[in-house]
């Protein structure tokens, strides 16, 4: 693929997985709205990067802030500064934001609010760790976690949304979140890149990462465990999740070797 296409795909896939399920679709739409050329012009200024990231997410309009926080958001200054910067940059590059109504907040832990995840992604981009080359250079799980590790800008250490203050917290990605990002982002990218380029070392590395990481702990994996299956690592859990979604849920028992053997009894 052309380099620009590779970058766009890498950022799209990474962004989608920053939604951790609930906001996955919204983050993908956001990534598709992200003008990489425009951001590249200002990548040495973290404030401007965050302004474009937040603005393209549709989060810099006053009506996106809960009414009880609007006055404080205007008074603390950061929201207004970001918004003014985005208005300038959006005019300069003819930017159009996504529909903010795509974001979901209900039953979402504050740590997973779009503002927090977008600030973390802005930090990654600013620190030159959002591209494909950095992921390809990570030869171990430890190195991959170092590439993915990020925190928020200073304002978000004491906020979860504009105008709503909280106890100071640097809001690093948790070990659990890092594992999920490696499983759902790094591994597929390594495997696809290896297949496309005919370089098996990347495919092998993807499998090595899955074998090293702990199995996911979700309702699908627990269901299989209750059936007596041993799930030793992330490779096992990914296989069982795929089995459930592509065969069980679609009633494809006759195409499934396990289902076929079960039905023969």
Give the ranges of each region predicted by the language model.
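Acidic, carboxylate-rich catalytic segments that either coordinate divalent cations
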Residues: 226-265
């Amino acid at each position: 693929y052309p380099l620009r296409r590779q970058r766009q795909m890498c950022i799209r896939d990474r962004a989608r997985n920053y939604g951790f399920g609930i906001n996955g679709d919204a983050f993908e739409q956001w990534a598709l709205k992200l003008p990489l050329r425009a951001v590249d012009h200002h990548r040495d200024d973290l404030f401007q990067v965050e302004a474009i990231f937040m603005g393209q997410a549709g989060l810099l309009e006053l009506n996106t802030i809960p009414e009880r926080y609007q006055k404080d958001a205007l008074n603390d200054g950061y929201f207004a500064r970001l918004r003014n910067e985005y208005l300038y940059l959006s005019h300069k590059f003819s930017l159009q934001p996504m529909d903010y109504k795509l974001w979901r907040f209900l039953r979402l832990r504050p740590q997973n609010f779009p503002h927090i995840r977008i600030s973390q992604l802005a930090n990654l981009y600013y620190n030159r760790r959002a591209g494909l080359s950095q992921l390809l250079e990570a030869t171990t799980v430890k190195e991959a976690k170092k590439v993915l590790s990020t925190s928020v800008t200073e304002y978000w250490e004491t906020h979860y949304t504009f105008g709503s203050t909280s106890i100071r917290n640097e809001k690093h990605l948790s070990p659990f979140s890092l594992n999920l990002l490696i499983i759902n982002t790094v591994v597929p990218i390594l495997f696809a890149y290896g297949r496309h380029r005919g370089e098996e070392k990347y495919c092998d590395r993807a499998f090595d990462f899955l074998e090293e990481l702990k199995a996911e702990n979700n309702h699908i994996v627990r269901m299989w465990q209750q059936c007596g299956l041993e799930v030793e690592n992330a490779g096992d859990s990914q296989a069982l999740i795929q089995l459930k979604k592509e065969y069980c849920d679609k009633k494809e028992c006759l195409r499934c070797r396990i289902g076929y053997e079960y039905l023969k009894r």
